[in-house]
Curated annotation (Swiss-Prot):
Role played: Catalyzes the transfer of endogenously produced octanoic acid from octanoyl-acyl-carrier-protein onto the lipoyl domains of lipoate-dependent enzymes. Lipoyl-ACP can also act as a substrate although octanoyl-ACP is likely to be the physiological substrate.
UniProt entry tagged with the keyword Cytoplasm: yes
GO cellular component, one term: cytoplasm
Protein name in UniProt: Octanoyltransferase
Family designation: Belongs to the LipB family.
Major site of localization recorded for this protein: cytoplasm
BPL/LPL catalytic domain segment(s): 32-207
Family annotation (PANTHER family): LIPOYLTRANSFERASE 2, MITOCHONDRIAL-RELATED, OCTANOYLTRANSFERASE
Amino acid sequence: MSESTLHVRYLGKQDYESVWHAMQDYTDNRDASSPDQLWIVEHPPVFTQGQAGKSEHILNPGDIPVIQVDRGGQVTYHGPGQLVAYPLINIKRLKIGVRQLVTDIENSIVQMLEGYQVKAYAKADAPGVYVDERKVASLGLRIRKGCSFHGLALNVDMDMSPFQRINPCGYAGLEMVQCKQLGGPQTVEEAGERLVKTFSHNLGYQNLIHHQGLSESYE
């Protein structure tokens, strides 16, 4: 049954806009029987500005493009060495609300890092995952027709300097950290593999079907 099956798509390195439009298309065209999916991807350097985003939080983008997008939250950075995961989930079918989905995503990251003896936690007033008040994962979702898209970004082994060109998630002086510094997963592939396990467990998926890349129908 589709309720207990999660399709996991490994997209490799893909530009942000093409993946964004693909997840919009999937969400717009899905119906009650369309399977839930989790897309795992890395993006080239890009700043994305959420719907609540204020331009003053983009300090000095330089040669990195800024894209205005339709997710919640403020500005963030994506780049090589960062695990990006997009849960395309029918939350109406799962009978959970958006707050529960956010909590499940945050807990999936916290539990994954626990496996490396890294003590991470979420904050009620600032979505994402933190270690010693430094942010290791950012979160921004959109719900349309009872289904989620956009998702999370986990810093793994990347050039962190572009975060200094913005106020990450709208917080001036927020310090970012990455898994490599913390003794967590050392590669995006390793982090993705571990996160798929904790995420699917927390959302109650019993069957995982793995795919490489996107097909025209995404199914």
